């Protein structure tokens, strides 16, 4: 079986490793904001960076800081507060850039910018723990239902994503798409789920590395028979780790999930590192929309929905649609609890799921619902 190429990129190119211990959210939002300010006050911040120079990965509280392979990472809710406070301290212009600058096309990588066809999501449940107590909250069934439901029942959450495009007629730096002659992100009218694999041949590592996660995506492509670049053109592989594991340091790092891609003899393979997010409770979205037992799995649909949407619009980072600072469509709308773009239940053909909004260039805001283009 082919192994991933050395170009998996997305090796750690830093030497810096800023890690914050993640604790469940128990304090009030004002208390968390005060704590964030106190932490910021303890940093030697130096001269402020200009808005033109600042990148998302420059924020020391961002999951991508020192780990630039963590594309579109969902920060824990605590980390998001720290990130926003750091932006504030370093000047409102930087914060405005990250929140309000439109997404622009990155020109594509290997001719690929977005998933300009019907999305195909392959769920990969990584490790024998999935059949031995590694799924105490029923996440496997929930995720299968989520991706089966997307695009059904007239849901318009997916509509926001369909405005983004790629192709030879789309110039690098474009912020709009010609609806008549450019291929756009496809709408999954019969659901996005293309396959499910419980890879129980061996236990999932306690702390899977990026190389192990990328290799699991390659293994999944082989399992599903997707062994050509054409068969992977509109595919994404969600590598879901079981409860009690810490892929890429999950639990001691400051993220809930991230996406990336690897190269292989099967073509470029987009994949998501999807930890068992209920292990971090409210920090990764438990009960963010729904109270009690109804919201126990909110984090799985919010976080995986974030990464799914970003993979569709920036399939091989960062050749797709990002801001000048490196944010993707999900990053701009993460953890909004009220007002425009607030996370909400999205009704699909098989039920309702807690989802976050995503950025819409054509309305200049975070939209939880949008016309299908």
Report the location of each language-model feature.
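Bacterial N-terminal signal peptides that target proteins for export
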Residues: 21-35
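Bacterial N-terminal signal peptides
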Residues: 34-44
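N-terminal zymogen propeptides
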Residues: 46-107, 126, 150-160, 165
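Loop/turn elements at helix/coil->beta-strand transitions in domains of secreted/extracellular proteins
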Residues: 117-121, 232-237, 267-270, 297
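Solvent-exposed loop/turn segments at secondary-structure junctions
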Residues: 127-132, 170, 242-248, 276-281, ...
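Active-site-proximal segments of metallohydrolase catalytic domains
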Residues: 174-262
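Catalytic cores of secreted/periplasmic or lumenal enzymes
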Residues: 266-373
